[in-house]
Amino acid sequence: SAFQPVPYITTYGATKAFVLSYSRAMNRELKPMGIRMMAMNPGWVRTEFFNHAFQTNNRVQYFNYVQEAKDVVATGLKDLYKTKKPYSVHGLPIRNQVRLVKLLPHSIVMKVWINQQKKAKNNNNLTTK
């Protein structure tokens, strides 16, 4: 959500984009003091959020490649201490998605997102892959 516009969860996506931009800028500002700041961009993580999302009529119902929190944290800590990356992305599917949305026009990215959500809604697909 931080790397692409996401219709129907607009505020969520905008907030994620802000946090990514803020973290990258703060990381640069804090560098002379030896302080690192890194944004976590894990994709979907199995948390209490899912219990609430499944109980609403929210249009966003398709949770692709849900990660376990402990795995996301392990990747984040590894990236924080062993790389100079300004952000951490857990899992190959999400890393590939981040790369792809940087190359495609936002209009196409949003169409794909909307079609994915419509497909999930039509199939009552509330499960994860």
Model-derived segments and spans:
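SDR active-site lid
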Residues: 27-92
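Active-site helix of classical SDR
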Residues: 15
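C-terminal tail/cap regions
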Residues: 63-65, 71-129
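A short, exposed helix-loop element centered on a Lys and neighboring polar residues
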Residues: 24
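Active-site segment of SDR-like NAD(P)-dependent oxidoreductases
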Residues: 1-4
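Active-site loop immediately N-terminal to the catalytic Tyr-X3-Lys motif
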Residues: 6-10
